[in-house]
Amino acid sequence: QMCIRDRGTISDVAPILWQNGALARLKKGETIDRLLFNGYSTISLGYAGLYEMCVRMTGKSHTSPEGKPFALQVMQKLNDKCAEWKAAENISYSVYGTPMESTTYKFAKSLQKRFGIIPGVTDKNYITNSYHVHVAEEIDAFEKLKFESDFQKLSPGGAISYVEVPNMQNNIPAVLTVMKFIYDNIMYAELNTKSDYCECCGYDGEITVSYTHLTLP
């Protein structure tokens, strides 16, 4: 039932994908039906708001000693359900740590409309991406990556973690230390750093931004 919309689709709709080798080498006019099963393709079960869910259910962040075991249990339940569906339908399902971008706002407004304002849960105009540590929590880059690595293991359909650092142009060894930690400890992560350039004076560094103007050192 989950693949009913894709059944009967012919390879001609995207020749590069289905006929020329990007995904398969089907004949013209051939349907993609046989590629929907037997592990060739995957249906992703995306999720977001693990932090908010944990606050609502336990009163604690999922980074707390009380919250983390519960959050991991919920993640394992999602994986168990995907395995159950796969066994029943011969279709691959996988849990996906969704990078929701603007959808975090849409989901937050929908939750507010349905449940009202709940402190720590629906009192912001966004929900936290996937398993991510909430942006307001004080946590260093290494601790964050190590914590989130446990949830990436339970997001086999895809996941990405982020760490924010200041301008590191003059501290490349520190950047390499973070990158090595990522390589050794987590499946996939991104390092975001600030590096600005002023086209008027040529300043290359970090520029302070306000609503009305830019401030250079």
Protein language model annotation of sequence segments:
Residues 1, 5-56, 167, 184-195, ...:
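Structured mid-domain segments that build the active-site/substrate or prosthetic-cofactor binding neighborhood
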Residues 2-4, 212-217:
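Conserved small/polar residues in nucleotide/adenosyl-binding loops
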Residues 6-22, 66-68, 87-98:
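Short, glycine/acidic-rich hinge or "gate" loops at secondary-structure transitions
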Residues 36, 40, 61-68:
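Short, charged/polar micro-motifs that form catalytic or ligand-binding hotspots
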Residues 47-55, 72-79, 176:
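Predominant activation on well-ordered alpha-helical scaffold segments within soluble catalytic domains
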Residues 63-83:
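Short secondary-structure subsegments characteristic of cysteine-rich extracellular domains
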Residues 74-80, 180-190, 214:
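C-terminal, active-site-flanking charged/polar segments
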Residues 100-105, 111-209:
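Catalytic alpha/beta core of large soluble enzyme barrels
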